[in-house]
């Protein structure tokens, strides 16, 4: 017996479609949640645990996260922490872009810079701090940029022209999203 609108015979059950595979993002989230014991590192550091001991037993991503939390507190060890955070990125950027010649080609150079920066940290606000630190390190004693680093200086400035307004908008959204804009 055939039912209208169906190509199936009456006694057969329609075949079930296989469920779509789990999304990659969902699997990554589950993996990150499974590694949650590292989330109390900052509290343990505040309670007096030695920083070297905490950093010795965790994954590189957790190390970086703990160092950023300590750096953002602005306490006494912040300059040493800043060196640990900024030195690897600065060294890689200087090695990769230090000897290139101007002009900066936005379509080629900026995506390469962004990809290099994302290897170290995906957050735009942290990349902004790293680039500002890079600009200060590129300057010599008189405040001038050496000729071999002019390209990297221009490239970092171009990226900061994007990052600073972007981070400002995100900051405004986070701070003022609960307020109504009645003037608009």
From Swiss-Prot:
Belongs to the YopR family. Gene3D superfamilies: Type III secretion system virulence factor YopR, core domain (1.10.10.1000). One of its GO terms (biological process) is protein secretion by the type III secretion system. Its main location: secreted. This is Probable type 3 secretion system regulator AscH. It is found in: Secreted. The gene is ascH. Keywords: Plasmid, Secreted, Virulence. Induction: Part of a gene cluster encoding T3SS structural components. May be involved in the regulation of the assembly of the type III secretion system (T3SS), also called injectisome, which is used to inject bacterial effector proteins into eukaryotic host cells. May control the polymerization of the needle. It holds the Pfam family T3SS_needle_reg. It comes from the Bacteria. GO terms for cellular component: extracellular region; type III protein secretion system complex. Residues 1-25 are annotated as: Disordered.
